[in-house]
Amino acid sequence: MADSSFDIVSKVERQEVDNALNQAAKEISQRYDFKGTGASISWSGEKILMEANGEERVKAVLDIFQSKLIKRGISLKSLDAGEPQLSGKEYKIFATIEEGISQENAKKVAKIIRDEGPKGVKAQVQGDELRVSSKSRDDLQAVQALLKGQDFDFAVQFVNYR
């Protein structure tokens, strides 16, 4: 019988992020407490730019955006938001969407699988993802349950289950 496998990835659908951003922008434009504050959220290249005329307001914009991401099923571990910075009369927050598993994080995950996972399960780093293979599908499901119970500082998805 051939080996079964799945990939561990950290990916975010850009369209879902765009939808969350548009929903947040619409809510900001309609809320009474944001009238006249210059609060906005938009794409700035690959970054997301949030701005308002007060530090509390720009943090509130970030909070709204985070709530929209959660509603769209995107993990907040994928969002890397900076600190509010004063720029002229406005405060700005730049945020990026983190994708891919770094080499050191992939090694940590592989070590957890080796140490705590079932015997006979192999984990190989392939670029920014991790391939886990075994002869038994039950072992692969046990590895998935093990990894879901871990608290990583990056989002984890399982794809290509074969």
Swiss-Prot record:
GO terms for molecular function: nucleotide binding. GO terms for cellular component: cytosol. It comes from the Bacteria. Transmembrane segments: none annotated. Keywords: Nucleotide-binding. Pfam families: DUF520. The keyword Cytoplasm does not apply. The keyword Nucleotide-binding applies. Nucleotide-binding protein. Belongs to the YajQ family. This is Nucleotide-binding protein SGR_2909. It comes from Streptomyces griseus subsp. griseus (strain JCM 4626 / CBS 651.72 / NBRC 13350 / KCC S-0626 / ISP 5235).
